Structure formats: C-alpha cells, structure tokens
C-alpha cells in the first residue's frame, strides 16, 4: 500500500499480515460498515430465522426422541444416526439440505474436533455414554447450526460430573 493512502480496517478483526502491510498508510481504525449493515436484521429476516429454527428444532427433537428410544434395540451407527436426522429434517416444509457435513460422534469420538464419521471410522451407538451431534440445515427461510450432547443411557460418575460442569458454564 503506498505511503499516505487512506485505508479503513478494523484492527480487532484484521489479521497480522494485513495490519503490517498498512504500516505507511493513513489507517482509519473502525468496524466495517458492511459488517454493521449485515448485523442489522429486518423484521422479515428475524421472522424467517425464527421459522427456520422452529422447523429444525422439531426435526432435532424428533431425532433425539427416536435415538434415545431405539439405541440398544436396533443397530444404529454414527453414520446411520446422521442419516436418520437428515430424514427427519427432510420431512420439514421448505427443507433444502444440510448446511454442512454432520458431526455425529459416539463416546471418545466426541472429543475429536470436527470429527466426521466415515465408513472406516463409523462405530455402533450403544446405550451408554454420549452422542455428540453437530448438524445444521438449509431451509427456504434460513440456515441453522445446532450442537447437542445426547446421553444414550446410564452415565459414569465422571461423565455425569463433566456434563454438569459444562452445563453450568
């Protein structure tokens, strides 16, 4: 950037390389006006977000109920659980598809950041421990992203304590 050039940037969000490249410029350090405009939602946008989240919430609640009542009674794996959640979403009006690849992680897999079950890593769900579900959907009204830790059966004292601490914040 030529010396003396006026450049607007937000030092709170710009990366180091960008800030270093502005050393000779006249920097106007303030939030991006584009970000500020995008942050303001119209009443129609707010209503659509609400509608999308209600639809998604219905699908996720149905899935959790199904999962907790069927685990241990029929074969369910991480991959088949993700597919079942997708089928519950597909029953909702205006559903367009997943917003990202589902993370459905049983037991120790839940500790792997951005774990994604594959044919090689897929494991059966058992009526114990937790299933971590990080999923989302695209609806005509908006996009969702939801993460839930679902107990699948009796928990160890350590699991119960850790879960409680996380819920308390």
Question: PLM features: residue spans?
Answer:
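Active-site neighborhoods and metal-handling regions in enzymes and metal-associated proteins
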Residues: 1-169
